[in-house]
Amino acid sequence: SCRSKADIDKYKWVADEKLYEDNDFVKEHHLSRHCIGLSGMKFTDAEIEVLAEKIRKMKADGTHLCCSIGFLTEHQAKVLKDAGLDRINHNLNSSRNYYPNICSTHTFDQRVANIRMLQGLGYEICSGGIIGMGESKEDVVDMLMELREIQPEALPINFLLPIPGTPLEHADMSVLSTAYCMKVLCLARLLVPKADIRCAAGREVYFKGEENMLLRVVDSIFAS
């Protein structure tokens, strides 16, 4: 984010050797899929072609591939689909009502439209949200009801980890008790029962010592 002053490593692309090494790890350990995350909201056609070539090489091993990649044009989405990309992650992040409080570069409706376009091209969809950004309980319910309409194949729930140098570095985390976090996951399970409910960021902090309890509600957890 242009608003972030966090101390992070910056680089264009992860080295091909690392990418293919991770893909080999996924295959050797019989993991369900390999998800590749890219920062940024939009990409050029030339950048998409570079990514498509990487996807072709990884897909040759039969890996189920997912990308978290921001907004795509229909042409770009078709290029990646033809290369073998199976799933795209595009989170709603919060409710329609609360979204302007966390993002000023685009609208909630633009995110929904991007997801609908991808579904129309035959992509599996991974879409969820982030809990702990100052939203109300009603906002959590509203976000999940929107996801109920979308019917993603996977629904990841992230619990905010405040990072120094970011706009939410001083966010009030007192609401995120283990019990509250579990209630959010249970609600996701009840409202979107066909989706794979996944616990993502924050599980090590908010479920510390209780992570086994997660598997009574969620289908999977994110690693690495």
Language model feature labels by segment:
Residues 60-61, 148-224:
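Auxiliary Fe-S-binding modules of radical SAM enzymes
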Residues 3, 7, 35-47, 98-99, ...:
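Glycine-rich, proline-tolerant flexible connector loops at the mouths of alpha/beta enzymes
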Residues 20-23, 51-55, 77, 112-115, ...:
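Generic structural signal for well-ordered alpha-helices
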Residues 1-18:
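Canonical Radical SAM [4Fe-4S] cluster-binding loop centered on the CxxxCxxC motif
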Residues 15-30:
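Alpha-helical scaffold segments that flank or form the walls of functional sites
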Residues 73-82, 133-148, 204-216:
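Catalytic cores of alpha/beta
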Residues 102-161:
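Aromatic-anchored, glycine/proline-accented short structural segments
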Residues 29-115, 120-121, 133-134, 198-201:
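Conserved SAM/AdoMet-binding glycine-rich loop
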